[in-house]
Amino acid sequence: MSHRRPASGTDGLGMSGVDRLVGEGARTVGAGAVWAVGDAGGTLGGGSHGLLGQGPYARLRPGPDTLHDLASLTKIVALWPCAGVLWQSGRLPPDEPLGRWWPPAAGHPAGEVTVRQLLAHTAGMLPYTRFEQLYGRDLAAIRAGVLAAPLHRPPGTAVEYTDRAAVLLTYLVEDLAGAPLDELAARWVWEPLGMADTRYGPLGTVLAARTAPTEYDERTGAHLRGVVHDPSARLLGGVSGNAGAFSTARDLARFLTALLAPPPGLPWGGAWIDESLREQTGGLVPARGLSWLCAPGTDPAEGTFVHYGFTGTGFWISRRLGRWALLLTNKVHYDRGVAQLTELRNAFRQAVFG
């Protein structure tokens, strides 16, 4: 990635300091890392460190064109903007319980929750998936199970992050739009922004060859590479709102730039971004926007938002500062420990946003 111009206000570090921070952090975490920082004009700077993986992957280094399993960043890159298209066109009422206007939810516990609560993770849904264990492998049975599952707590009483909210919202978005989420995301998000490498898996041989591997899979006897790591998304065929998308730092830079400077005619720009990037949880903690999390270590009033992915991915946005940042690692390839990665993420956020 080219350093287009120096960024101001990076806590005195500058781009070379941010690069050193990520390099040292990647060695401590023990994973490859790709980072970038930008503004409404595009990428300001970036870099990459470490190796793509162990064994046969130890000869490979990550870069801005390395595909990463985005894990829960899929919620932002695919599901959230598609929900925004429907919201801005008046087809997705944010505050009416689903059961009043979406027939599949009527008479079920899921009918008690609202779209806003699903996006803010205040819907009170079960905090785990366990789809195969609870419902088997049939997709219709899983959908029925998600709709009929009892709520974990009353809607609107607590913030509790759960993939079930994204899965339920996927069903709703697909029903309203009349197409699967991968087609909607490509049509409304990735193609308009020129995100040519972003897609759902499983990836073909050529793309898989430049994809960061995730965990070793006992069933196949190999590391997952180009196949979604998240077991729920894999069970759902690889396409879900909670996980399943793959992308590169180069493409994510285009996406984050568009949040600060939406292109004319973007069907989820403007009002949807305004609505989403403000606190939506009414003083409950942790504070969240719509899909986005208020960045840990910051005051929600500062308006710095983040989303993380289980595989080791993450990105941040601050409209107040006019800046975005991304940090992609393949941490889960090595182990599931999060303490050192959390330290790196927090230090990176502080360096870029203060």
Label every PLM stretch briefly:
Residues 11-70, 91-93:
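Short, conserved catalytic-motif segment at the N-terminal edge
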Residues 41, 69-95, 169-174, 252-255, ...:
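Active-site SXXK
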Residues 42, 46-53, 108-303:
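Short, surface-exposed loop or secondary-structure junction motifs
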Residues 68-71, 159-161:
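Catalytic tyrosine of NAD(P)H-dependent dehydrogenase/reductases that use a Tyr as the general acid/base
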Residues 93-108:
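Short, glycine/proline-biased beta-turn/loop segments that scaffold the active-site neighborhood
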Residues 117-119, 324-327:
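Structural recognition of the beta-strand scaffold that forms the well-ordered cores
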Residues 311-320, 324:
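Short, surface-exposed beta-strand/loop micro-motifs that present aromatic residues
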Residues 332-354:
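Generic C-terminus detector
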